[in-house]
């Protein structure tokens, strides 16, 4: 029903946000390590 639809959308959004946050975090760490911030 509608609940599984919302749950599926929430999971998809969560995964996307986590992926973007992870990418941003890695870039931040890399620029700190190489001192190019």
From Swiss-Prot:
Superkingdom of the source species: Eukaryota
Family to which the UniProt record says this protein belongs: Belongs to the frog skin active peptide (FSAP) family. Esculentin subfamily.
Keyword set includes Endoplasmic reticulum: no
Disulfide bonds: 31-37
Tissue: Expressed by the skin glands.
InterPro entries per the UniProt record, alphabetical: Antimicrobial_frog_2 (IPR012521)
Protein localization: Secreted
Keywords of the record: Amphibian defense peptide, Antibiotic, Antimicrobial, Disulfide bond, Secreted
Assigned GO CC terms: extracellular region
GO BP terms in the entry: defense response to bacterium
Pfam families to which the protein is assigned, alphabetical: Antimicrobial_2
Protein name from the UniProt record: Esculentin-2HSa
Role description: Has antibacterial activity against the Gram-positive bacterium S.aureus ATCC 25923 (MIC=32 uM) and the Gram-negative bacterium E.coli ATCC 25726 (MIC=16 uM).
Chief localization: secreted
The keyword Secreted is assigned to this record: yes
């Amino acid at each position: 029903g509608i609940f599984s639809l919302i749950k599926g959308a929430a999971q998809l959004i969560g995964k996307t946000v986590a992926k973007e946050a992870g990418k941003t975090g890695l870039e931040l760490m890399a620029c700190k390590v190489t001192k190019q911030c």
